[in-house]
Amino acid sequence: MTTVSRHYVLAAGGTGGHLIPAFALAVELDRRGHHVALVTDERGAKIPGKPDFLPAHVLPAGRLGKNPVALFKGLRAIWQGRAMALRLFESFEPSCVIGFGGYPALPALLAAHAARIPTVIHEQNAVLGRVNRLLAKRVDAIATAYGEVDRLDPKLWGKVHRVGNPVRPDVLALRGEPFPEFTEDSLFRVLVTGGSQGASILSEVVPDGLAMLPPALRHRLQVTQQCRPEDLEVVRARYAAHEIPAELGTYFEDMQARLAGTHLFIGRAGASTIAELTAVGRPAILVPLPIATDDHQAANTREVVAAGGARAIRQSGFTPKELAKQIQAMAQHPHTLANAAHAAWNCGLPNAVKDLADLVESFGASPIMDVIRLDSTVSAASGQEQLA
């Protein structure tokens, strides 16, 4: 724990995947007595879950397009964002700038490098993202969620720290809860989500796949499924036709409570999703998003699948028959599902936010406690304010 209060800037792209771990770190740094500010884009400033104490500064940020016009526009926006970030740093005086990926993080990190402010990047996925690849050689430390990170230059291993993906405190609080009782006579609770926007492929496949289960499993089903608004009535009709009780919605406020009571999760393989599943210890059938950059969702599944805590099905092979086959293999015998839950739990890194905060605190003014390098063998394989 530090003995001085410092200022930190978190820079993150405007999606939940980048911002959820940033919000978690903000809460931890605030708890330790520090002042924290967020730099993001207009989307990011509106993402639900931002702590009330955290001001969000909106900076221009452009993508580096392939055609000359798009490239010029992107570079101009990045340069403008860099200049605005430098003005913010003059008044806020951060001890460190922490990037969580996404193009909106780029201007602030470039500004920090120019101002000789220490920088840390956090990679949520098992593939180093584009912006983090651009910055990896320049930053002072690279925090990773996985022990194997593709597209990470082996020459940079010396500044890599495996910390994991920070998860929300309300989810982390479930880590000590036992896996829900699952016997040959109990309910079989299945939770299905497709990320922040739902996933139509899950709406198309899951109801029919569950209907193909043996009667001993099918008759015990209790399903909760997140759907896109346009899919709700069609999915409702499918479950009704199969006589499977299902609660459907576009968003569930009490998702952590539903996760606590779940026996099996079916959904995408985003980094935050897997971090929460392994923090709580819930077995899963994961369907990686096929258009994810660098196929990073498929890479995210490697560790938990190898451990026996989940099964992965490529979307091209995600059929009702294949889903039913995989569910039956996991849940036909109660001990099999319980073993998978334990394997998932063992993959969790519950101290991720603490370890990331310790790493961040190792840069800037002293005295502070030494940060422990967690894994030196990582392999390469709204308080919104518009800056003037």
From Swiss-Prot:
Which InterPro entries does this chain map to?
Answer: GlcNAc_MurG, Glyco_trans_28_C, GlycoTrans_28_N
Enzyme type, top EC level: transferase
Enumerate the Gene3D superfamilies for this protein: Glycogen Phosphorylase B
Record lineage: Bacteria, Pseudomonadati, Pseudomonadota, Alphaproteobacteria, Sphingomonadales
Q: Under which pathway is this protein filed?
A: Cell wall biogenesis; peptidoglycan biosynthesis
How is the protein disposed in the membrane? Peripheral membrane protein
Q: A cellular component term (GO) from this record?
A: plasma membrane
Q: Which gene encodes it?
A: murG
Q: Know the name of this protein?
A: UDP-N-acetylglucosamine--N-acetylmuramyl-(pentapeptide) pyrophosphoryl-undecaprenol N-acetylglucosamine transferase
Q: So what does this thing catalyse? A: di-trans,octa-cis-undecaprenyl diphospho-N-acetyl-alpha-D-muramoyl-L-alanyl-D-glutamyl-meso-2,6-diaminopimeloyl-D-alanyl-D-alanine + UDP-N-acetyl-alpha-D-glucosamine = di-trans,octa-cis-undecaprenyl diphospho-[N-acetyl-alpha-D-glucosaminyl-(1->4)]-N-acetyl-alpha-D-muramoyl-L-alanyl-D-glutamyl-meso-2,6-diaminopimeloyl-D-alanyl-D-alanine + UDP + H(+)
EC number(s) stated in the UniProt entry for this protein = 2.4.1.227
The primary location reported for this protein is membrane
Could you name the domain of life of the organism this protein comes from? Bacteria
